[in-house]
Amino acid sequence: MTAEEMKAAENGAQSAPLPLEGVDISPKQDEGVLKVIKREGTGTETPMIGDRVFVHYTGWLLDGTKFDSSLDRKDKFSFDLGKGEVIKAWDIAVATMKVGEVCHITCKPEYAYGAAGSPPKIPPNATLVFEVELFEFKGEDLTEEEDGGIIRRIRTRGEGYARPNDGAMVEVALEGYHKDRLFDQRELCFEVGEGESLDLPCGLEEAIQRMEKGEHSIVYLKPSYAFGSVGKERFQIPPHAELRYEVRLKSFEKAKESWEMSSAEKLEQSNIVKERGTAYFKEGKYKQALLQYKKIVSWLEYESSFSGEEMQKVHALRLASHLNLAMCHLKLQAFSAAIESCNKALELDSNNEKGLFRRGEAHLAVNDFDLARADFQKVLQLYPSNKAAKTQLAVCQQRTRRQLAREKKLYANMFERLAEEEHKVKAEVAAGDHPTDAEMKGERNNVAENQSRVETEA
């Protein structure tokens, strides 16, 4: 029965008592949710916890009174399965449906609106009957940009509400697939933020941080959240490959949050993390290094309880972290972020040689030649022996000349085309105001013929 057929059928069942029938699909087998399939769906897949599902539905009381229908609104209803956004019976029943399936669901009050009901249409302790058609379902998008780069589908819900934070120690069992080929199967224990050293994609780590203990999920990764444009030779993954992971979070131990750490702990951990970040940077693992330096900033940025001697160490760590963040951003070609990190460093030390130089490099990379030149000139003013700044200043001036030459040529061509068009217009106007010799000769002949004709007629 299609959505249209459902609407036609409901008109003939406005007040007819509805029978209690169907297969008991309630978890407790207490006949709280009964299901009858009216039309089989297609395929074998059913929605998983967290999936976004799209349905049409009509709801009746047991006496046949219709109390709601998405068909009347001519708009499908959507919700996230298993998140408590709808009545319990729906979370249970829709999880058993296939795309295209139409079913009747009979819901006891404890799986519907309970003793309170939903005034004014649904009375207290009401048993309800729904007809539901499932149109589609899709996994949960975990990306901040909502670009579909990390999609999660939960096979088995975890326990509790706690999730791993940055720096947490996690124990996972995983399987990685490229198309249908199993390329990775491991049980690992590692610190969140260091997955790259174990050849784990950044998108998988992000997904793990959204999981609960015991959760078993499927994670789908677009190339930019997997192994990107370079692929992964170890696993024979080609460039621009989409991946699928089956991952189970067996256990985890959360890292201390900033507010849980004493000042001494923050200072101690910052020194450890700084060394780790430097090691990652030397290995060319810039994203991992970036995460380490960000930790230092988050721990020390607004901490004011240090002693005078400690404050000097904190100042040095903050300055080094912003400078190192800028360098990581430059390596990753995130030039706006590099400029921002340099600005933060220069707020701490306005004449810092590395801060000025790296900001100049970032400005140069995005063709802001005036700003780049100003930074390199200030470096040379403060540190005349800086050969790299002299070289970059020369590069900056050379590129400025090239740009001016290109602009000059562009404008010259533009003016030349405008002049040609203007000349063409003038020529056309002139041709229109002054007939050609041939046209004038033709006109004189016509006048002579007309005059001869007039004389003959006279």
From Swiss-Prot:
Q: Describe its partners and assembly state.
A: Homodimer. Interacts with GLMN. Associates with HSP90AA1 and HSPA1A/HSPA1B in steroid hormone receptor complexes. Also interacts with peroxisomal phytanoyl-CoA alpha-hydroxylase (PHYH). Interacts with NR3C1 and dynein. Interacts with HSF1 in the HSP90 complex. Associates with tubulin. Interacts with MAPT/TAU. Interacts (via TPR domain) with S100A1, S100A2 and S100A6; the interaction is Ca(2+) dependent. Interaction with S100A1 and S100A2 (but not with S100A6) leads to inhibition of FKBP4-HSP90 interaction. Interacts with dynein; contributes to NR3C1 transport to the nucleus.
Q: What is this protein called?
A: Peptidyl-prolyl cis-trans isomerase FKBP4
Q: Which residues carry this modification: N-acetylthreonine?
A: 2
Q: Where is the composition biased (Basic and acidic residues)?
A: 434-458
Q: Which residues carry this modification: N6-acetyllysine?
A: 282
Q: What is its main location?
A: cytoplasm
Q: Which residue ranges does the record annotate as region Interaction with tubulin? A: 267-400
Q: Which residues carry this modification: N-acetylmethionine?
A: 1
What's this protein's function? Immunophilin protein with PPIase and co-chaperone activities. Component of steroid receptors heterocomplexes through interaction with heat-shock protein 90 (HSP90). May play a role in the intracellular trafficking of heterooligomeric forms of steroid hormone receptors between cytoplasm and nuclear compartments. The isomerase activity controls neuronal growth cones via regulation of TRPC1 channel opening. Also acts as a regulator of microtubule dynamics by inhibiting MAPT/TAU ability to promote microtubule assembly. May have a protective role against oxidative stress in mitochondria.
Stretches the record annotates as Disordered:
1-24, 428-458
Q: Which GO terms describe its cellular component?
A: axonal growth cone; cytosol; microtubule; mitochondrion; neuronal cell body; nucleoplasm; nucleus; perinuclear region of cytoplasm
Which EC number(s) does the record attach to this protein? 5.2.1.8
The stretches annotated as TPR repeats are 270-303, 319-352, 353-386
Omega-N-methylarginine sites (modified residues):
373
The free-text domain note is:
The PPIase activity is mainly due to the first PPIase FKBP-type domain (1-138 AA). The C-terminal region (AA 375-458) is required to prevent tubulin polymerization.
Query: Where, subcellularly, is it found?
Result: Cytoplasm, Cytosol; Mitochondrion; Nucleus; Cytoplasm, Cytoskeleton
State the post-translational modifications.
Answer: Phosphorylation by CK2 results in loss of HSP90 binding activity.
Q: Give the sites modified to Phosphotyrosine.
A: 220
Which of UniProt's keywords are assigned here?
Acetylation, Chaperone, Cytoplasm, Cytoskeleton, Isomerase, Isopeptide bond, Methylation, Microtubule, Mitochondrion, Nucleus, Phosphoprotein, Repeat, Rotamase, TPR repeat, Ubl conjugation
> Does Nucleus show up as a keyword for this record?
yes
GO MF annotation: an example: phosphoprotein binding
The modified positions for Phosphothreonine read 143, 436
Q: Which InterPro entries does the entry mention? A: FKBP4/5/8-like, PPIase_dom_sf, PPIase_FKBP_dom, TPR-like_helical_dom_sf, TPR_2, TPR_rpt
**Activity control note:** Inhibited by FK506.
